[in-house]
Amino acid sequence: MRSVDSRSSVTRWVCLTSVILFCFCIAVMRYGGVKKRRYFYGFCLHPRERADITEVILRFPREERNASRELRWVKKDRQWFIQLAHAIHPAKQEVLERLFQYLFTKRRFEFITNNTRFFSDYALGKQPAVQMKFTKKNGAAIGDIYFGALNGTGLGRYIRIGDNAAVFLTEDDFTPFFRDEKRFWCDTRQFHELFTQSQIQMMEVSGKYIVRSRTSVVFKEVEQFFARFSYVDVGPTPTQWKESIVIHRGDGKIIRFRLQPAAHQEWTLWDAQSVHAYTLSAYTARYLFALISRMQTETGMSSLQQFDTEENLISD
C-alpha cells in the first residue's frame, strides 16, 4: 500500500514539475532571449480618453475588434499611450485608420516615435513613406523631405531637401542652411519619416522660406502643420480681437480671419466672409501671431499668404 502511495506521489510530483518546466519554457520563449527591436507609433492619452477610445473599439464589429488587437496600452509617466507595431497587415489597415481618424477629429495627440515627440496627423495603417517634396519650376521633384533630430541630439529639428539643403526648425525661426552632406547629414536609419500625403509645402519667396498649401482653403492645414512642433515657445497670448490673417488665393479672393478668446484657454478663429469657425489651442494662437509678426518684419508681407501658382515654387 505504501509503495502504491509513493508511486502516485512521485507521479504527481513528476507531472507538477513537468507543468512548471513547460510553463517556464513558454515564458522564456515569449519574454526571454534576444528581443526584436519594436518600432512603434504611440499616442499620448489621458485616462479618460483611454476609456473613450476603448469604448469606441468595443462598438466595432467583431472582425474589426480583432484587428484592433494590434493596439496595446502602455502606461508611462502617469500617461497612457496607444502602441502598435511598425508593420501593419493590410487587412488591419482600415480599422486602424478608422480608429485614429476618430482620435484626430477629437483632439490632437502627441506623436511618439522612438522617444522623439512631435505632433502629427499621420494616417496610420499606411506605409510611412515621405510624400512631402520640394518642386522645381518645371514640376520635377528636387528631393524627398525627411524630418529628424540632428545626430540624435535633439538640439535641432530639420527637414532635408535633396542632397545638401536643409531647413532647421528651431525655437526662433525657419532658417535655411546649406552644408556639406558628410558633415551635416546623419544616418538615414536615425530619422523617422512622419509626413504622408501632406498638402503642406515650404517654399522660398525673396530668399525666405514660408509655408504654402496646395489647397485653396489653407488655414486648417497650416495650423495642423505648426502644431506639430511642440517645443516652440512664442510668448504671451494676445487678449483682444485682431484681424490677424489674410490669405490671398490664386483666384484673387482674399480670405480674412479674426481670432477671439474662447473658454478653456482656446481661441476661436472666425472666417469673416463665410462665418466658418475653427477652434485653436492657446499655443497655436500664440504661434500664429508670432509667425505673422515675424513674416511682416522679415519679408515685408502684410499678412500670411497662400501662393497657388507654380511660379512661386522653390527653384534652383
Swiss-Prot record:
Broad class of the protein's primary localization: membrane
Subcellular location: Membrane
Superkingdom: Bacteria
One Gene Ontology term, aspect cellular component: membrane
The UniProt record lists the keyword Membrane: yes
Membrane topology, from the record: Single-pass membrane protein
Residue intervals passing through the bilayer: 12-34
This protein's UniProt keywords: Membrane, Transmembrane, Transmembrane helix
Annotated protein name in UniProt: Uncharacterized protein TP_0878
Record lineage: Bacteria, Pseudomonadati, Spirochaetota, Spirochaetia, Spirochaetales
